[in-house]
């Protein structure tokens, strides 16, 4: 072969071989390799870790998508990029109002949101049970009094499945229609003459019955027992179907909150007395108690009952379900070391998480709770983002203490002075704000960030 022609052929072959080699190299320079460079500049053969676009369209970004408009009903305080989902069709309403009736006789009121977006308020007027219906702005639509004594103790109210209302207080319970017209009144404790139930809370169960709890009440014929916690089952017509008592032999056992359990039973929270050192029961019984939680069947048969606490003072005040199938109990604690006059600076908020069997999973303590011997008012609610919020009375810094924690939201710790002492009730409203009532007849409607 002619030498010049041979050289040309060799040159062409070298070019062809070099190009083929270049085409078969991957991003890592490996001939025949399968590494690929992703949109973030990372070169490897693992396609499972390729970067992706976040909601802001940034490759490898870490933006949290959601509504960043604090005036929207679905505002997300954790969102870093507004994804256009903000719902501003519902106007966020906030207010603080005193709703004292003309002849107010009891400064503790309860409030619940109603299906029409307004509120139902329970209180005391001239010594008797009193209901007030308001619109969404807290302005009165109607108010009525009933022949049920209510000048002492706490009271509670719920909207019932038929659109009416059920009021419960220290003397008994009453049911009304949607306009507040009385349908029935149930006074006293069945088979216990001259005793009242001192109701603290009520629910309408999914089975259609009302369950009311309170105390302390001494069961008929139980002269060796102190006042016990009480559970009463009432049907829609106002007939008492079951009355049950719970607790020990010491004074002042009572329930303060009841909910339908995760499995459709009943869960009740309150306080149970215990001894003082060598004494089986204490003369200063309000200072020697445990948190008392009882789970029962639908006729009150005990499934389990537990106490939580030590040698001194713990009280259970409210309870809600948790997203993982357990319960969050709100209470208070004073480790007074047998000096009952030292609780002023020592009393703390106690948040107790338990499972369906009552096992103690976690305890959280917060300092700064004001101390009342009969129990500092406290109320607890779930939030729509999986967390919790409580209202109570702070030792200083204001008259209402609002605290939100858990779930996917940032913790809020806020003290305010709206004109009442906080802690009677709190619940989330349909615009993701909160409605709460206080001692002093002040109601407060906040936004989702607890501002008003």
Spans of features found by a protein language model:
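A sequence-level/structural motif corresponding to short, flexible coil/turn segments enriched
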Residues: 90-452
């Amino acid at each position: 072969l002619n030498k010049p022609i041979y050289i040309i052929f060799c040159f062409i072959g070298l070019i062809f071989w070099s190009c083929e080699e270049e085409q078969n190299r991957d991003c890592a320079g490996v001939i025949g390799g399968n590494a690929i460079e992703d949109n973030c500049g990372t070169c490897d053969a693992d396609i499972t870790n390729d970067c992706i676009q976040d909601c802001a369209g940034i490759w490898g970004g870490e933006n949290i998508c959601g509504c960043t408009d604090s005036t929207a009903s679905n505002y997300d305080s954790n969102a870093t990029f507004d994804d256009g989902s903000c719902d501003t069709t519902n106007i966020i309403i906030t207010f603080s109002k005193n709703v004292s009736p003309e002849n107010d006789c009891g400064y503790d009121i309860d409030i619940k949101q109603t299906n029409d977006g307004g509120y139902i308020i329970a209180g005391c007027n001239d010594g008797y049970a009193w209901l007030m219906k308001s619109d969404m702005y807290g302005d009165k639509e109607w108010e009525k009094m009933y022949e049920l004594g209510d000048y002492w103790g706490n009271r509670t109210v719920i909207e019932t499945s038929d659109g009416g209302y059920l009021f419960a207080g220290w003397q008994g319970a009453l049911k009304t229609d949607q306009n507040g017209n009385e349908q029935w009144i149930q006074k006293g404790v069945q088979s216990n003459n001259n005793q009242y139930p001192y109701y603290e809370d009520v629910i309408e169960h999914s089975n259609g019955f009302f369950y009311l709890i309170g105390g302390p009440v001494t069961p008929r014929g139980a002269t060796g027992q102190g006042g016990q916690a009480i559970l009463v089952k009432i049907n829609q017509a106002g007939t008492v179907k079951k009355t049950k008592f719970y607790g020990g032999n010491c004074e002042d056992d009572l329930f303060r909150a009841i909910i339908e359990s995760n499995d459709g039973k009943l869960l009740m929270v309150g306080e149970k007395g215990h001894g003082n050192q060598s004494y089986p029961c204490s003369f200063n019984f309000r200072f020697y108690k445990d948190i008392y939680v009882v789970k029962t069947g639908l006729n009150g048969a005990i499934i389990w009952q537990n106490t939580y606490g030590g040698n001194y003072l713990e009280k259970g005040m409210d309870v809600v379900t948790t997203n993982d199938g357990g319960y969050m109990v709100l209470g208070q604690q004073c480790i007074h070391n047998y000096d009952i006059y030292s609780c002023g600076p020592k009393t703390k908020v106690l948040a107790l998480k338990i499972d369906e069997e009552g096992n103690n999973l976690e305890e959280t303590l917060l300092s700064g709770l004001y101390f009342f011997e009969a129990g500092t008012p406290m109320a607890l609610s779930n939030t729509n983002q999986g967390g919790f919020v409580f209202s109570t009375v702070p030792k200083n810094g204001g008259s209402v203490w609002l605290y939100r924690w858990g779930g996917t939201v940032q913790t809020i710790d806020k003290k305010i002075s709206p004109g009442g002492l906080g802690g009677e009730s709190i619940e989330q409203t349909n615009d993701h704000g909160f409605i709460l009532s206080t001692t002093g007849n002040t109601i407060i409607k906040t936004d989702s960030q607890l501002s008003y």
